[in-house]
């Protein structure tokens, strides 16, 4: 962050980032946010979404900013982590209606029993259907991860 801030100070540009680490030993999720939209954690057994919120300025804004790590413990098999750019919920159809976070969550909910790859494809297919070829103003980027049944000891997963 210090180097980036020095490089971009005069330009007014910045970069967002989310760093997420899943610790297999205790099934905990650790994250740091730097201005990026919060990731979502979906618990299908409780049918509950939660945003992985936390403070964090975009990278390059303040070279002295100290980022905080946040932790969530006790993730279970089937929990889904989705992190994307705001271009997903801001995707618009020809009438300029936004796709929305609610619709995004509903597609995840309806496909929660599938693999992470299949959930990702379902979201992109639904966005494509919704937008009907309308030109988008922002990038649409998504990563989906799903906690497995039988996690073996090993290195942490980093998203």
Label each region the model flagged:
Residues 1-159:
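Conserved subregion of the PPM/PP2C metallophosphatase catalytic domain
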């Amino acid at each position: 962050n210090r180097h980036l801030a020095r490089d971009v100070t005069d330009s007014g540009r910045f970069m967002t980032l989310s760093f997420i680490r899943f610790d297999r030993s205790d099934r905990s999720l650790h994250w740091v946010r730097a201005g990026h939209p919060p990731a979502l954690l979906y618990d299908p057994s409780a049918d509950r979404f939660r945003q992985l919120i936390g403070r964090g300025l975009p990278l390059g804004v303040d070279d002295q900013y100290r980022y905080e790590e946040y932790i969530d413990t006790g993730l279970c098999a089937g929990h889904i982590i989705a992190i994307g750019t705001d271009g997903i919920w801001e995707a618009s159809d020809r009438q300029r209606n936004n796709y929305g976070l609610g619709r995004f969550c509903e597609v995840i909910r309806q496909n929660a029993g599938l693999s992470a790859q299949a959930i990702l494809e379902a979201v992109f297919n639904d966005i494509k259907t919704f937008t009907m070829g309308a030109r988008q103003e922002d990038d649409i980027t998504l990563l989906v991860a799903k906690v497995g049944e039988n996690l073996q000891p090993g290195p942490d997963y980093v998203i």
